[in-house]
Amino acid sequence: MSGNRIQPRSVARLAAVQALYQMEVSGAGVDSVIREFGEHRFDRDVEGEQLAAADETFFADLARGVVTNQAKIDQGIVKRLASGWRLERLDATARAVLRAGAFELMYRSDVPTEVVINEYVEIAKSFFEGPESGFINGALDAIARDARD
């Protein structure tokens, strides 16, 4: 059973995507959202089940990193969208997944490319049942080639 336990960084990535989404739709600032997650969402019991522990430092680094570097991250994403597509045309959740993944690919060279892409594709699958995860896979792969080659 412990082999199925979600890794703390995986939990942090999912939380970062949720936080980025929350910031976009509510207009909340990064520090208040990080504080909210730390106080109310991590290490909590939900309906009798203990949630997996998150790497809270990694979570905060992801959230702050995306916000700090969002203009450059968005440029990297837009470069890989189909001709004529604008970032705003994407679903807010897809934008959050792409931004978090692109941040890691562009600014966290300590994390292997394959790990980043796989983690965010799995996160996308948890939100979408359609072709979005394939789109995110392709976009992150292209961003990785731009950022790491």
UniProtKB/Swiss-Prot annotation:
GO biological process, one term: DNA-templated transcription termination
A Gene Ontology cellular-component term: cytosol
Molecular function via GO: RNA binding
UniProt entry keywords in alphabetical sequence: RNA-binding, Transcription, Transcription antitermination, Transcription regulation
Gene3D superfamilies in the record: NusB-like (1.10.940.10)
A family per Pfam: NusB
Highest rank taxon of the organism: Bacteria
Full protein name: Transcription antitermination protein NusB
Native organism: Caulobacter vibrioides (strain NA1000 / CB15N) (Caulobacter crescentus)
Gene: nusB
